UniProtKB/Swiss-Prot annotation:
It catalyses: tRNA(Asx) + L-aspartate + ATP = L-aspartyl-tRNA(Asx) + AMP + diphosphate. The lineage of its organism: Bacteria, Bacillati, Bacillota, Clostridia, Lachnospirales. Residues 206-209 are annotated as: Aspartate. Transmembrane segments: none annotated. The gene is aspS. Pfam families: GAD, tRNA-synt_2, tRNA_anti-codon. One of its GO terms (molecular function) is catalytic activity, acting on a protein. This is Aspartate--tRNA(Asp/Asn) ligase.
């Protein structure tokens, strides 16, 4: 039967006690991690969010009745204990913060009993994720998840402190807003008051933070929930958290400067990592040419080399055919992997096919300087030697080549270098390599839609020198956009915004909107631009992704208290769920019956 904690007040969390507290009478409360009855003495590991503390119940100290109560303790019982802090009489536990002390109990209250949990509540549980998420309230008791959520809280606190000290105002923007279809799908919320009309949950506070700049709030931030109805993967959720900011009277360098100092403070004070400033910058073009990715992982080399010029006249039709069709031939050097078994090479070729490759050409350099290759019979010895030299290869190396349109080649080799690095365990989670990627293309052409779409969003300012190209060659326009990349993951991104109405209208025109359509969707922003707009720019971090990397986790689900799974459902609450007909009727909604196959 549960007891009351009336008259008791917790004096310390478990790991707040140390040798300096020896001799003190304390009251601690928490969950029983485990209990060991040694006959006449019971050892209990008590756990709270701070960690573990050993409690001793000795029959000679507390009497038979309380000792019998202590003998009934099981894992996950919630208890309150009053006792005296002592130096450990037995062996010191070097693995615990409290490993040199223990509390000798004088009073015990069982505040709540527990059924046997469906899985062990312990560090590094091997329990299947589905079961852990179904019982997330138990999973969240595990020390590794406690550490992750404490880290997340610390990062949010440091962010608020830093930005407040830098003159930013924390301002909330609406959760119920207007649907402006462009990019990912919106989550829609039906209006009861306006039948047949819908709100959208915001994919970002983009428009509202720009309106705040128009309103004169020249430095804004918030830590905010955003929503996107898109397919999930390890680093995506339907609802996610952004550290969002916007600044007036600034350009690219100003935004980067503030954020470099924020990252430096955040990493130093939360996980003890020094971030060297300034952070390296690289244009989008250079990132693609060197790494095949606009979010390159720079913890290792294996950079792409363009060998198109070298092979344009060779006898290998795969290479020459790609070049004749306007593509390129590029390669990577897997240093020291010349003895890779054919089975592993074949697995890498299959991997590359998953990114659009028709195949991969490969060449290994034997220790005696001879070559073993899938295409050597089509090239002369001189051509092969020139190719090896261009790839800066030496005996024992293995080269892979892709030949196709640039988009395919970059996608294939960019992902192949990561796969090889994973296989060779080159991705050190204790290394944090930041990189700014700048000067993205403003637009990309959608063959499916037959029009240009914004690579970031339609409010991004073109590079000043590229403005005339909006009229003549929109595909070549570069954006004043910047992403912050950490270990191959984009953790934040932003841009300088368009602040002249004529440029914004031109941007919408290039995107295929008529003036009427642009005003229908974004009229409130375009109208605001008629009343004096400061130059402004901003950036948003994905807090979930950032903390995931700081915590050295592989999925953002491990740094979110109550995450969704890949089909966007919640295993804990069974959301989404069917609602009553009455609720639908109040919202003037009727569900269409799906046709079923007979």
């Amino acid at each position: 039967m549960a007891e009351s904690m009336k008259g008791l007040h917790r004096t310390h969390r478990c790991t707040e006690l140390s040798n300096s507290n020896v001799g003190e009478i304390v009251t601690v409360m928490g969950w029983v991690q485990k209990s060991r009855n040694k006959g006449g003495i019971i050892f209990v590991d008590l756990r709270d969010r701070s960690g573990l503390l050993q409690i001793i119940f000795e029959e000679g100290d507390i009497g038979t009745e309380m000792f019998e109560k202590a003998s009934k303790l099981r894992s996950e019982f919630v208890v309150a204990v009053v006792g005296k802090v002592e130096t450990r009489s037995g062996a010191v536990n070097e693995n615990l913060l409290t490993g040199t002390i223990e509390v000798r109990a004088t009073e015990l209250r069982i505040l709540s009993e527990s059924e046997t949990p469906p899985f062990p509540i312990e560090e590094g549980s091997k329990t299947k994720e589905e079961l852990r998420l179904k019982y997330r309230y138990l999973d969240l008791r595990r020390p590794d998840l406690v550490r992750n959520l404490m880290l997340r809280s610390k990062v949010a606190t440091l962010t608020r402190q830093f930005l407040s000290d830098e003159g930013f105002l924390e301002i909330e923007t609406p959760m119920l807003t207007k649907s402006t279809p462009e990019g990912a799908r919106d989550y829609l919320v039906p209006s009861r008051v306006h039948p047949g009309n819908f709100y959208a949950l915001p994919q970002s506070p983009q428009i509202f933070k720009q309106l705040l700049m128009v309103s004169g709030y020249d430095r804004y931030f918030q830590i905010v929930k955003c929503f996107r109805d898109e397919d999930l993967r390890a680093d995506r959720q339907p609802e996610f958290t952004q550290i969002d900011m916007e600044l007036s009277f600034v350009d690219v360098d100003d935004v980067i400067s503030v954020n470099e100092r924020l990252l430096q403070k955040m990493f130093k004070e939360s996980i003890g990592i020094d971030v060297s400033l300034p952070i390296q910058r690289m244009t989008w073009r250079e990132a693609m040419d060197r790494y095949g990715s606009d979010k390159p992982d720079t913890r290792f080399g294996m950079e792409l080399k363009n060998v198109s010029e070298l092979v344009k006249d060779c006898g290998f039709a795969v290479f020459t055919g790609a070049l004749e069709n306007g593509g390129s031939v590029r390669g990577i050097n897997a240093n020291g992997q010349g003895e890779m078994p054919r089975k592993k090479i074949d697995a890498l070729i299959e991997f590359a096919k998953g990114y659009g490759a028709k195949g991969l050409a490969y060449l290994s350099i034997n220790e005696d300087g001879t070559y073993k290759s899938s295409f050597s019979k089509f090239m002369t010895e001189e051509e092969l030697s020139a190719l090896v030299a261009a790839m800066e290869a030496k005996p024992g190396d293995l080269l892979f080549f892709a030949a196709d349109k640039d988009k395919v080649v970059f996608d294939v080799l960019g992902n192949l270098r990561l796969e090889i690095a994973r296989n060779l365990e080159l991705l050190d989670k204790n290394t944090y390599n930041f990189l700014w990627v700048t000067e993205f293309p403003l637009l990309e052409y959608s063959e499916e839609e037959g029009r240009y779409t914004a690579m970031h969003h339609p409010f991004t300012m073109p590079m000043d020198e590229d403005l005339p190209l909006l009229e003549t060659d929109p595909g070549k326009v570069r954006a004043k956009a910047y992403d912050i990349v950490l270990n191959g993951t984009e953790v934040g991104g932003g841009s300088v915004r368009i602040f002249q109405n004529n440029v914004q209208e031109k941007m919408f025109e290039v995107l295929g909107f008529t003036k009427e359509e642009a005003y229908e969707r974004f009229g409130f922003l375009l109208n605001a631009f008629k009343y004096g707009v400061p130059p402004h720019a901003g950036l948003a971090y994905g807090l979930d992704r950032l903390v995931m990397l700081m915590a050295k986790e592989d999925s953002i689900r491990d740094v979110i208290a109550f995450p969704k799974v890949k089909d966007a459902s919640c295993l804990l609450t069974d959301a989404p769920n069917v609602v009553d007909d009455k609720q639908l009727e109040e919202l003037s909604i009727a569900l269409a019956k799906k046709a079923t196959e007979e």
